[in-house]
């Protein structure tokens, strides 16, 4: 469950916040693709990241602030043809160092006990259908950092 520290690594950090108050909800709107905050770049790879809370928000889509402490379904739609061949893992950690929305890989690596900060971990898996999904039920409000790691299918590289 370690982040790959010894090799050339690039990780994409997705920050999201879970609040009980719906005043902080930021639903995904119909923005242009190039302005879409839900599009994440993993080096040269792109994916569209969306969070749903079906029990409390029906079909509303979120990509940063998650309004409710409830079950959250994370969907990453692959926008690059290489991603369906890559082993992808997903981790949610508490923002124990309080770095907030601008967390970096260095901030994550600075956590002394990543295992203790991790509230959810989905081991690497290949999703050839073009979508990666995971579900986690938050039990406390707070700031959480999502970390996605992609393993190149033929080269010794991680993204």
Task: Label every model-predicted segment.
Residues 2, 27-28:
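N-terminal export/targeting leaders of redox proteins
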Residues 2-12:
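Bacterial N-terminal signal peptides that target proteins for export
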Residues 12-19:
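Sec-dependent N-terminal signal peptides of Gram-positive bacterial secreted proteins and lipoproteins
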Residues 22-24:
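N-terminal signal peptide c-region/cleavage motif recognized by signal peptidases
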Residues 28-133, 139-141, 149-159:
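Contiguous segments within soluble domain cores/interaction surfaces
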């Amino acid at each position: 469950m370690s982040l790959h520290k010894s090799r050339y690594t690039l990780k994409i950090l997705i920050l999201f916040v879970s609040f009980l108050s719906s005043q902080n909800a930021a639903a995904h709107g119909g923005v242009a693709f190039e302005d879409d905050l839900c599009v994440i770049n993993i080096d040269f790879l792109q994916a569209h990241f969306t969070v749903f809370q079906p029990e409390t928000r029906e079909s509303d889509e979120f990509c940063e602030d998650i309004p409710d402490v409830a079950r959250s379904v994370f969907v990453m739609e692959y926008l690059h043809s290489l991603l369906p061949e890559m082993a992808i893992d997903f981790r949610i950690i508490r923002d124990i160092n309080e770095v907030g929305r601008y967390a970096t890989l260095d901030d994550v690596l600075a956590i002394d006990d990543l295992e203790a900060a991790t509230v959810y971990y989905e081991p690497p898996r290949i999703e050839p259908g073009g979508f990666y999904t995971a579900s986690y039920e938050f039990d406390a409000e707070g700031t959480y950092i999502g970390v996605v790691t992609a393993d190149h299918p033929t080269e010794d590289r991680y993204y």
